[in-house]
Regions:
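Acidic catalytic cores of enzymes that act on phosphate-bearing nucleotides/polynucleotides
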Residues: 1-14
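Conserved small/polar residues in nucleotide/adenosyl-binding loops
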Residues: 145-150
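A glycine- and small/hydrophobic-rich beta-loop-beta segment
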Residues: 22-120, 125-132, 142
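A translation/RNA-centric and nucleic-acid-associated enzymatic feature enriched
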Residues: 14-17, 81
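Active-site loop-to-helix "anion-binding N-cap" substructures in soluble metabolic enzymes
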Residues: 3-5, 19-22
């Protein structure tokens, strides 16, 4: 309940410090803090999702990335990578190393959009807001994706 977009949060403490508390390990005993993130964003259930895609691109991300609940089979909501939210998560968790997963999903896209800021009430900010309202609009940077597919035997 401490971080995220209230009331769409969990009562669990999901930050790195919560792991220390749960395991009974002193925070000063932790060396590196690895932040693992997807090359795109997903969300389960309701709640604000600034970069959510409601079009064919969102469907493709979901299908290619196999974004379905393991137990329920429920389709996850998919959207472009949100660097504002990622930066906030890095700060809150004290991340020292980043690991990106599911980058291979991007192989099927020529252009990738990344949210680098938000426009809220006519003002642009790269800070994560305490409250996400319908007035928020992501500001995107477009990237051309030219990396070869790791599934291509000629590149292995």
């Amino acid at each position: 309940m401490d971080f995220g977009s209230y009331p769409f949060v969990t009562s669990s403490n999901t930050v790195c410090a919560g792991v220390c508390t749960g395991l009974g390990v002193a925070p000063n005993r932790i060396g590196e803090v690895f932040g693992i993130f997807k090359a795109y964003c997903t969300r389960v259930g309701s709640g604000p999702f600034p970069t959510e895609l409601f079009d064919e691109t969102g469907e493709r991300l979901c299908d290619i990335g196999h974004e379905f609940g393991a137990v329920t089979g429920r389709r996850r909501r998919c959207g472009w990578l949100d660097m504002v939210a990622l930066k906030y998560s890095i700060m809150v968790n004290g991340v020292t190393q980043l690991i990106m997963m599911k980058s291979d999903v991007m192989n099927d896209f020529d252009t990738i959009r990344v949210a680098t800021a938000y426009e809220i009430g006519g003002r642009t900010t790269s800070e994560f807001p305490y409250e996400i309202t319908g007035d928020l609009r992501p500001v995107y940077t477009c990237l051309l994706y030219t990396s070869p597919s790791p599934r291509d035997p000629k590149t292995s």
